[in-house]
Amino acid sequence: MNNNIEHQIADYLLDDENVIMAFTFIRDSIVLTNYGIYTLDVQGISGKKVEVKFFPGKNIKSISFESASTFDLDVDIKISVDGNTAINQNGIPYNAPISFKVPKKQAEEAREIVKLVKMHYLSR
């Protein structure tokens, strides 16, 4: 695992929580553990502000992968989860997916995330 990611989530991991795999795409990261999924959203110009979110494995409902077309620069991953509440333009709350844009050159890593999410959270 990337040492920077490991450092950023070390304080959040439980004693018996193990990292399955971690991925970084541009500045943001996703970390899969035996307990669930962490997302690290790097914010600001300096990148010193990082929002860490955790989604328990039991809240993960589905995953989608959208491939890049000829003119796209990235592929999209969306993980549907309960508890990631957002408000739409009409003021109505909904469960927003965890959403990542992945550079086309890292598409294989994105496919690996799909496999790991299915294996560890959706096949139980």
Can you say where each PLM-predicted feature lies in the sequence?
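Intrinsically disordered, low-complexity boundary segments flanking structured domains
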Residues: 5-11, 51, 65-66, 86-88
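Canonical pleckstrin homology
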Residues: 66-112, 123
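Conserved beta-hairpin
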Residues: 21-49
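Phosphoinositide-dependent membrane-docking surfaces
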Residues: 37-38, 50-68, 78-82
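Hydrophobic alpha-helical segments
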Residues: 47, 70-72, 117
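Anionic N-terminal interaction surfaces
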Residues: 1-32, 94-96, 103-113
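Long, non-globular regulatory segments flanking folded domains
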Residues: 118-124
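Acidic Ser/Thr/Pro-rich low-complexity disordered segments
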Residues: 38, 43-51, 84-95
